[in-house]
């Protein structure tokens, strides 16, 4: 696999609710996180500040557990997911299709859309 697998918001939510250990990574910017966030633990790694965390990614993420990546619409998260696979050797990487916007529509309308 050289690109992340797409996962719909409802599917990801169901897997999390079932207790599956999936690491959630949000690559959006601070101001986006302030506008809308998931109501569960998320590792915040904004792409614009990659230089601050890139050399620590192995300490921040467990490569033995699946990683689901999200952004606003699914593009930046897909790029980060490709990097995890191609450059860091992660094998179980999911990209939240439609990003947090899809989560707002499919799972939790209390999460603001922007």
Regions found by a protein language model. Give the residues of each.
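Rhodanese-like catalytic fold shared by cysteine-dependent sulfurtransferases
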Residues: 1-22, 30-66, 75-114
């Amino acid at each position: 696999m050289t690109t992340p697998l797409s996962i719909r918001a409802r599917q990801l939510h169901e897997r999390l609710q079932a207790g599956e250990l999936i690491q959630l990574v949000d690559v959006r910017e601070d101001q986006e996180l302030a506008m809308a966030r998931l109501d569960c633990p998320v590792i915040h790694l904004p792409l614009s500040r990659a230089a601050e965390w890139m050399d620590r990614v192995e300490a921040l993420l467990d490569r033995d557990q699946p990683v689901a990546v999200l952004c606003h619409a699914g593009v930046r998260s897909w790029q980060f997911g490709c990097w995890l696979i191609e450059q860091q050797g992660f094998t179980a990487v999911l990209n939240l299709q439609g990003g947090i916007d899809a989560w707002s529509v499919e799972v939790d309308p209390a999460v603001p859309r922007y």
